[in-house]
């Protein structure tokens, strides 16, 4: 059997399928850990001694284990159980509960909680909601496609950044990997700057102090590897989601006149100052900000190589994305638009330099006379910013590791320690994080805008590449006569959903180009500075793409469907046919029907089937 291919499931009944996989994975993990321990004893030449239980010896042992964890992973030839795995193994420490919370809350930070204030001022309330609505349709199609590929290539380091290289074109894969890696490397200082801006709501103390505190905090979290990241995100995202729920309830009460110092508000701000700020061009400014706000949701796939049971966790997380879109993004955005006028001087990007710029969530509550609560909201916004900084320090090193394994970066960066941490890549990310100490500069908001310029457009490129990869994957499966039963999870939006996502992404890029050459606030006149602030990622992508073409002298623009390698790196699922599943379900239903007291109702089994299908679809 080819080492690069993992046959995850054999012929089995539907009920035994996921259970047997989990049992085998758990037993193999135990066996592997035991074998590694034996090998370590053989290499050291020492006989295992009974462990002393006094506190001093325990402390010494813990310290030794901590320092030893930074050593390079044991080479594969010391353990036959590891020979079939990737060269650098990332620790499988992320559980299903972590992944569900990551899919719901990761990425809720700068874009939604802070950056929305700027685009509200340029687009108006109706423009902001319309832009987010279109972006939401695209995102759902993308995540469904990415979930299908994510389960097929769960063990691939770098995950979706390597899909284009395998399924579309190596040059496209290289360009997307480069720009996406740069995005996550710049997101870290962006969040540090945002943290300093958030703290200024309370105090005017030197911002670099807070940058240093947040920086050290996320470093400590990530020193615990993927487990530390996952547990921290579980806590952070729980706080964010609770804040969102609380904000929704409070915002409705305020709008109805039940809190604060004002009467019923209703849709007052949609009439005065109005629904749109700058017409259709204002709506176009929303698209990239919406993409940036939704960014980070794909991290659930990047962590696939470190998940204990991706067969269960990835489909569940992908299905729950719709709740994040509707409840966390769309609903909160609509409520903010009902409580904050787009001409408010307190919004980020306002022309009034004397205003105290704050998050639109804080403005929505504080401007209507509600006391204390804005401080809690601002505190959760700070937690959200720290959460995204934590995600960037998790994602950035793993993307660098993927580039190093592909030979794009020096091989020394492929160093992975015994706890599964890409250590040298981690240090490179820390260097980029130091940019965050410009928070004390007078040009703080300018730095924020430039860092956001790199991040926002990059998100569209990675999403488009994921959809293109899914399209080419389906084309190759059909062309080579492969069955879709080999796929563990099928995208609910199907083949054409990916085409819709690609078309929307292209539309966004065209709109962003229009806004870049004819900015809203420049009265349609070209401004080079504003152009690059809106379109900075495009030159990076083009340079990386054509540079790769020239260097490798590869002039084909895609891999033919019949030549796409569908075996290497892919998990192949062999599940029972649909006919067999139906037979099992029918037999079970028949027994339940005969033994049930309500067997007189012939529609009972049919209703149970319908309920089960609905549950599987939404949950």
Swiss-Prot record:
Q: How does it sit in the membrane?
A: Multi-pass membrane protein
Provide this UniProt record's keywords sorted from A to Z. Amino-acid transport, Isopeptide bond, Membrane, Phosphoprotein, Transmembrane, Transmembrane helix, Transport, Ubl conjugation
Q: Which residues lie on this side of the membrane: Cytoplasmic?
A: 1-99, 144-172, 226-233, 303-320, 390-422, 468-499, 551-619
Family affiliation: Belongs to the amino acid-polyamine-organocation (APC) superfamily. YAT (TC 2.A.3.10) family.
Which GO terms fall under molecular function for this chain's record? Answer: amino acid transmembrane transporter activity; low-affinity tryptophan transmembrane transporter activity
Report what the protein is called.
Valine/tyrosine/tryptophan amino-acid permease 1
Which residues are exposed on the Extracellular face of the membrane?
121-122, 194-204, 255-281, 342-368, 444-446, 521-529
Q: What's the miscellaneous note?
A: Present with 504 molecules/cell in log phase SD medium.
Gene3D superfamilies linked to this entry = Amino acid/polyamine transporter I (1.20.1740.10)
Gene field: TAT1
């Amino acid at each position: 059997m080819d080492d690069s291919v993992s046959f995850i499931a054999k012929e089995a009944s539907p009920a035994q399928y996921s259970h047997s996989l989990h049992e085998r994975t758990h037993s193999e993990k135990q066996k592997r850990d035991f074998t590694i321990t034996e090998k370590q004893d053989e290499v050291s030449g020492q006989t295992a001694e009974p462990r002393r239980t006094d506190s001093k010896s325990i402390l010494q042992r813990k310290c030794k284990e901590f320092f030893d964890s930074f050593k390079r992973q044991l080479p594969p030839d010391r353990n036959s159980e590891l020979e079939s795995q990737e060269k650098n193994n990332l620790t499988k420490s992320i559980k299903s509960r972590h992944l569900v919370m990551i899919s719901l809350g990761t990425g809720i930070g700068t874009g939604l909680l802070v950056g929305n204030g700027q685009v509200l001022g340029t687009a108006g309330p109706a423009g902001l909601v319309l832009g987010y609505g279109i972006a939401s349709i695209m995102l759902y199609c993308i995540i469904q496609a990415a979930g299908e590929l994510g389960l097929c290539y769960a063990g691939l380091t770098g995950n979706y950044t390597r899909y284009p290289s395998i399924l579309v074109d190596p040059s496209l894969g290289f360009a997307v990997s480069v720009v996406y890696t740069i995005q996550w490397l710049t997101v870290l200082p962006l969040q540090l700057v945002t943290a300093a801006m958030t703290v200024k709501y309370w105090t005017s103390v030197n911002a670099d102090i807070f940058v240093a505190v947040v920086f050290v905090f996320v470093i400590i979290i990530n020193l615990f590897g993927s487990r530390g990241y996952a547990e921290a995100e579980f806590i952070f995202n729980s706080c964010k989601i609770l804040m969102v729920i609380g904000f929704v309830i409070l915002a409705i009460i305020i709008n109805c006149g039940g809190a604060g110092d004002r009467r019923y508000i209703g849709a007052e701000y949609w009439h005065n100052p109005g629904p749109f700020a700058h017409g259709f061009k204002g709506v176009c400014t929303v698209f990239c900000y919406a993409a940036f706000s939704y960014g980070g949701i794909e991290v659930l796939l990047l962590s696939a190589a470190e998940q204990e049971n991706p067969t269960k966790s990835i489909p569940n997380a992908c299905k729950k994305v719709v709740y994040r879109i509707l409840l966390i993004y769309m609903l909160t955005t609509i409520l903010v638009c009902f409580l904050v006028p787009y001409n408010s001087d307190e919004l980020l990007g306002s022309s009034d330099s004397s205003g105290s710029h704050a998050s639109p969530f804080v403005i929505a509550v504080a401007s209507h006379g509600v006391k204390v609560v804005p401080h809690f909201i601002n505190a959760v916004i700070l937690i959200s910013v720290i959460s995204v900084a934590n995600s960037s320090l998790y994602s950035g090193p793993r993307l660098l590791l993927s580039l190093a394994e592909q030979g794009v970066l020096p091989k020394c960066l492929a160093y992975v320690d015994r706890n599964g941490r890409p250590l040298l890549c981690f240090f490179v990310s820390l260097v980029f994080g130091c940019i965050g100490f410009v928070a004390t500069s007078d040009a703080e908001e300018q730095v924020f805008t430039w860092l956001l310029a790199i991040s926002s457009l990059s998100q569209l490129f990675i999403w488009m590449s994921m959809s293109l990869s899914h399209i080419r994957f389906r084309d190759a499966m059909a062309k080579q006569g492969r069955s879709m039963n080999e796929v563990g999870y099928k995208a609910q939006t199907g083949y054409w959903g990916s085409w819709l996502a690609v078309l929307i992404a292209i539309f966004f890029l065209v709109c962003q180009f229009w806004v870049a050459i004819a900015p809203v606030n420049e009265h349609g006149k070209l401004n080079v500075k504003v152009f690059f602030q809106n379109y900075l990622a495009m030159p990076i992508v083009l340079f990386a793409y054509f540079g790769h073409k020239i260097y490798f002298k590869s002039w084909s623009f895609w891999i033919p469907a019949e030549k796409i390698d569908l075996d290497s790196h892919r998990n192949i699922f062999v599940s029972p046919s649909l006919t067999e599943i139906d037979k099992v379900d029918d037999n079970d239903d028949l027994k339940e029907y005969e033994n049930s007291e309500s067997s007189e109702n012939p529609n009972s089994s049919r209703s149970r089937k319908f309920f089960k299908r609905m549950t599987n679809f939404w949950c």
